[in-house]
């Protein structure tokens, strides 16, 4: 699962800045930045929050074969 793509796509679809998205998830701006740049992956609890938001906003969590 490509969390950097998912986090950025979700945040963009929600029309939020990294700071606003960080507040919504209860993490720091730096954490969102690290996720989007692929330096770190979200911990399990944050992955669950992201998955719920992805479902709400119609974002696929798994990559399709043609996207690989």
Predicted regions and their residues:
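A short, Lys/Arg-rich alpha-helix, primarily the initiator
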Residues: 1-13, 51
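Short alpha-helical DNA-recognition segment
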Residues: 15-33
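DNA major-groove recognition helix of helix-turn-helix/homeodomain DNA-binding modules
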Residues: 44-63
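Short acidic DE-rich linear segments
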Residues: 65-68
